Amino acid sequence: VKDPRQQGDMGILMAFRESDGEFLWQHANAKLIAGRVHDWPYQGVCSSPLIEDGVAYYVSNRGEVVALDLEGFRDGENDGWVQDESSQNEIDADVIWRFDMLEEVGAFPHNMSNSSPVTHGELIYVSTANGQDESHVNIQSPFAPAIIALNKTTGELIWEDNSVDDRILHGQWASPTVGTIGGVDQVIMGQGDGWIRGYEATTGEKLWEFDTNPKDSVWPRTRNELIATAVVYDDLVYIANGQDPEHGEGVGNMYAIDATKRDDITETGRVWSYTDIRRSISTPAIHEGLIYQPDFSGFLHCIDAKTGEVYWVHDTFAAIWGSPLVVDGRVYLGDEDGDVVVLKTGSELEVIAEMNLGSAVYGTPVPANGALFLNSRNRLFALAAD
């Protein structure tokens, strides 16, 4: 915590100057009173912010979708509809609007709110994280939506969907993605019943749904939910399924889905499936027809995007929580041991380098302006290009 006035366990989003890492401002939120059922202790913020047109959008630990002015209060202005921030110093965040998903749509987050926002046009999309209660049996809020769309300027609710209903296996921690498939702008999100669904981006009309579990998987512990973010590539949707990392390792599945189909496309939309993979919470990276897909057991799989043929598998020897980055002919991937491996892109396995950051790497590297930014559990690094 950079502000000595803020003490104790909190969820905090910090802003730093890109050029030299100087701390600028932070958005600090107290933990929810309900405790670990909604807001697991000492886990901070699990949402990655989206930056667009001078605004940072993210989901706080309190289940709020928040829009923040990137300038904070350093510009001498209190922007937006929220004017009652408790502190308005230059190191405080300037809140433009907030949408409380617990209050407004009745969401009941399980353990953490974990969605990273995505935008399309005037709308912003997030998962509500609605899930089971502490019993891991009951759904306290079965009518709450799984996905919502808000006006990104005002925070007004535009549409919602609850196709999951009361079939949530555990929690809902995936993030939506947006893509144009067959000429139709779609919002796509994996959900807590193990199904992935696609919606018309503007209206929220459900276009299709696909079950990522074998039909003989009928009991909750034999079905995987979806935590990763889907990727759209050449009119196909790619995603791997998994479970809460606390459940450990297990059998997973990865799919290529033809999302030009409609309604239940579990059979008609399946292009290929890849079963030699363990449970995964990672989003694939796709480059020049090759998929780089990690699993939670520590393996990185290189797969042909058209056929599902596997070219190689690299063992990192540690659990993988984050997702790979492909840039300049290289694949970057961190693991729970704090190692970051760099591999050459292509159908032949070649490890270029490996370094250790001193503590676990749970996030995904981000490139910008000739540098690579990545964080370990307790540090943020900016690495210069060679």
Q: Could you say what each language-model-derived stretch is?
A:
Residues 1-386:
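Noncatalytic, solvent-exposed loop/strand surfaces
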